Amino acid sequence: MQPRVTTTTLFKMKQEGKRITALTAYDHPFATLVDAAGIDIILVGDSLGMVVQGKQTTLPVTMDEILYHTAMVTRACNRAMVVGDMPFMSYQSSINQAVDNAGRFLKEADASAVKLEGGADVCPVIQAIAKAGIPVQAHIGLTPQSVHQMGGFRVQRDEERLVSDALKVQDAGAFSVVLEGIPSDIAGIITKKLDIPTIGIGAGPGCDGQILVLHDMLGLHDRHLPKFVRQFADLRTQAARGLEQYRDAVRNGSFPAEEHGYK
């Protein structure tokens, strides 16, 4: 069995120039596959609201819902670092609320770390959670929980603010930072300035690692994919074909056959 990926593992990978791989997962079967594939980080993202629950944004996801999914994922993983995504309004009201909710991911769901969105504005929260002994992954740029404030899912281009936010979340104690929806050149500048690893999603090839939503890259749905997504499989088409074959086999009497019964 390979050793578990830790924050130290990720720091070393950045120092050695080894690319970090990350994906989302939301349940035990898929987390088992992702972990077995050697993916370094599994994020149990609040994106589950959109890709699993069928909602329009990530905002309605609750702590209890994401803890339920995180626990399923951690039970499947032997190597990958499992990061729990702190949902909207689970850390914004007070620092005490944020620390308590972050702690629930480790105590109740056996996660290794938490992720939260925001730059300079959430640095006191990052600092408090990290001080409590909980590893924190930051997330700057396009932050889906602020979709209404941003006026939609828009690429973020303010280089000065983005670089400043990245440096500040690092100083606050984040062990890594997700860069989402940022021009490639700015993401590259940030990556070179930081000591902690950068994980890109729609931020170009210059980041220390990459993350995608599992359902997007495996082709598990038919919704519009962002420009930055590469589809590595078409499981929806394969699943539809299998379901249709099952339907036809039951209707024409070829399933179940004699070998599927007991004597």
Swiss-Prot record:
Coiled coil: none
Main location: cytoplasm
Gene Ontology CC, one term: cytoplasm
Cofactor note: Binds 1 Mg(2+) ion per subunit.
SUPFAM superfamilies according to UniProt: Phosphoenolpyruvate/pyruvate domain (SSF51621)
Family annotation (Gene3D superfamilies): Phosphoenolpyruvate-binding domains (3.20.20.60)
Positions annotated to bind Mg(2+): 46, 85, 117
Enzyme nomenclature, EC number: 2.1.2.11
Binding site for 3-methyl-2-oxobutanoate: 46-47, 85, 115
Keyword check for Cytoplasm: yes
Keyword Oxidoreductase: no
One GO BP annotation of this record: pantothenate biosynthetic process
Catalytic residues in the record: 180
GO molecular function, one term: magnesium ion binding
Pathway: Cofactor biosynthesis; (R)-pantothenate biosynthesis; (R)-pantoate from 3-methyl-2-oxobutanoate: step 1/2
Entry keywords, A to Z: Cytoplasm, Magnesium, Metal-binding, Pantothenate biosynthesis, Transferase
Reaction catalysed by this enzyme: 3-methyl-2-oxobutanoate + (6R)-5,10-methylene-5,6,7,8-tetrahydrofolate + H2O = 2-dehydropantoate + (6S)-5,6,7,8-tetrahydrofolate
Enzyme superclass (EC): transferase
Subunit relationships: Homodecamer; pentamer of dimers.
Function statement: Catalyzes the reversible reaction in which hydroxymethyl group from 5,10-methylenetetrahydrofolate is transferred onto alpha-ketoisovalerate to form ketopantoate.
Family: Belongs to the PanB family.
Name this polypeptide is given: 3-methyl-2-oxobutanoate hydroxymethyltransferase
Source organism of this protein record: Desulforapulum autotrophicum (strain ATCC 43914 / DSM 3382 / VKM B-1955 / HRM2) (Desulfobacterium autotrophicum)
